[in-house]
């Protein structure tokens, strides 16, 4: 291991030496650029673009382009990138991540690679964690890019498709990661090329890259439609759960105590019923066996109710706003996530727990993981001050290297060892005493908490101590920038949950660095608990000591903190026993404790990485399917050629499947088998008068296929004759194909989503769930392709084509919307019209639509009460 570490350090040194040389090359242009007039400097942009058009690469232009942007920044922004910022910019251009400490000017660093890559005209996406930062950075840096002759756009959730398209067509586009991903999904749900907003993905530069590519990667981006409501079952399961005896996650000291109705695994945060709990469930729901196959749906509701009541914690995992809406709290930033909902019914279970209106369950219509979205960019890079702890993940998932960049000035912040107390009460008393001591000296203080309830508890204690302060948590995040901007003023006390205002610098006010005692100089950061991720702790520390300013950091811990309870070892418990003997106020400073905490954090980080990797592994299974379907959709939307050859292939394969299926089920020489085949053909492809039993009788399978195909070609030609105009024919072909593909694709990914839940249980049978998922999804994909071709054939053959005017009137209405929850209907139903009767059909009879499925498994799902 030491050899590996030594090698990594040597590689970093070698890379820094190379970057240093390149930065000096950029600086060698400084005098030349300084002597240019504004007009001459601005003229450099079209000149560089022309050189690219003539064949020079971006790498060829790097030194000069960086120097142009650097000089322009001095004239427009009054800021001149330092040597280390040039080094960081080169790393960004290379598609990697420079690790730059807080306050080292990452936003200014990004201007140089953004300018260089925007010269290609292929688009640069600057990605931020929220819309406030996207708007702020676009406004501030957009002034520089516009001065240099580049166009700058801002992509927000509230913008219309036209406004989004305009933003994406700019040289540089600012956006959040979620909005980029959702726009990609929406683009692959529209039915007309004019409704698409994104261009091909070229270069993304991600600010706070660890937050977006790591922390947010556990949650896939999903566009949903409404599914049927099951509110009564959620309330019933919640009523049952509230009768159970056991511990909540936040107070649990062990997984299980004798007599409990459920047990919690503290490390994995999972929950299950004990034998006592199962007995109670069977009595409550009046069933014989809770885990019988016929009760699978019920166990799903019970499992969610257990998680909602005993694992998901109010004001930590979620909060309820004034509109009685349950909002998820991002565990890494402390911000709420409006518009995002827990999947698989968990959100509805929390709504039942909190006795607020239950929103309908959703049906997945389109989804993608953050990882697979960003891996589609030709080049991906990002900036952060805390990425080294996740270096393996960046390398394995994104093929990105982390390069630590030296600070412009030496770090002067004093980082004190952690202080460990036996109880929460003793810890918070020590925290308040420290705040009083520092506040009396006029030192600005930032107090970091992990949960909203902790921030409110400290706030209450500060009110009692008559210390004025500000609270920044998920409940008042809208004042974030204003609160953080004032947090460096003399005497300011600010409590922040997790986020500590990432993206907004805390600038020190007058007199703050002048104190005689170094302990009271600069901003004091007080951590009230270690986060499960070392990066979040480092981000909190990094709020102090920016650009060589003095500062101090101190973490206060308790053996009753959640992290210690989840991963505390026997050796720590021995400390606890000794400390209780010596009194509640006893405090430990120990290297062993610090190492134990870091070891616990590494284990949690490892678990989280495994979780993100598993999300990606599942999404990788359908990635190829998604790319094929989306590519084919785009071909259909963009083509100006008649699609008859494509349709003929679908017709032929559908006929082959129908004949082969009947041949497998019986003998084609048998009259009953031929009659069944004839009925299927008449139901799905041809009018009754177009084909008769006598024509099929006695033919071989291949001869039957040829005969039916000839008649289908004839029927298709007569259908197209009703649309004499080739443009109308293409419009009709496109409408049918897109409607069928979209319906089947959304059904397919929703089925995959449900199947994923079930294959997880197969791990208990020593089967690899990922392998099972791969095999099942491949079969389901092939079935979906068959269903698409069958349905396209049926609609093309059986549709009652309406007059051209009807189609012409409907075309302008084929649009999608920017509102996530409204994306449900993307196909123009009115251009295809056919009545099929579903009356008096038995559950096990063949479906009248001709799919070959039983009625209960096809249209019977919606027609059987």
From Swiss-Prot:
NCBIfam families: PRK09200.1, PRK12904.1, secA. It is a peripheral membrane protein. Transmembrane segments: none annotated. ATP binds at residues 85, 103-107, 505. Part of the Sec protein translocase complex. Interacts with the SecYEG preprotein conducting channel. Has a central role in coupling the hydrolysis of ATP to the transfer of proteins into and across the cell membrane, serving as an ATP-driven molecular motor driving the stepwise translocation of polypeptide chains across the membrane. Pfam families: P-loop_SecA, SEC-C, SecA_DEAD, SecA_PP_bind, SecA_SW. May bind 1 zinc ion per subunit. It is found in: Cell membrane; Cytoplasm. Its EC number is 7.4.2.8. Monomer and homodimer. Part of the essential Sec protein translocation apparatus which comprises SecA, SecYEG and auxiliary proteins SecDF. Other proteins may also be involved. Its cofactor is Zn(2+). Keywords: ATP-binding, Cell membrane, Cytoplasm, Membrane, Metal-binding, Nucleotide-binding, Protein transport, Translocase, Translocation, Transport, Zinc. Zn(2+) binds at residues 847, 849, 858-859. This is Protein translocase subunit SecA. GO terms for cellular component: cell envelope Sec protein transport complex; cytosol; plasma membrane. SUPFAM superfamilies: Helical scaffold and wing domains of SecA, P-loop containing nucleoside triphosphate hydrolases, Pre-protein crosslinking domain of SecA. Gene3D superfamilies: Helical scaffold and wing domains of SecA, P-loop containing nucleotide triphosphate hydrolases, SecA, preprotein cross-linking domain. GO terms for molecular function: ATP binding; metal ion binding; protein-exporting ATPase activity. It comes from the Bacteria. It catalyses: ATP + H2O + cellular proteinSide 1 = ADP + phosphate + cellular proteinSide 2. Belongs to the SecA family.
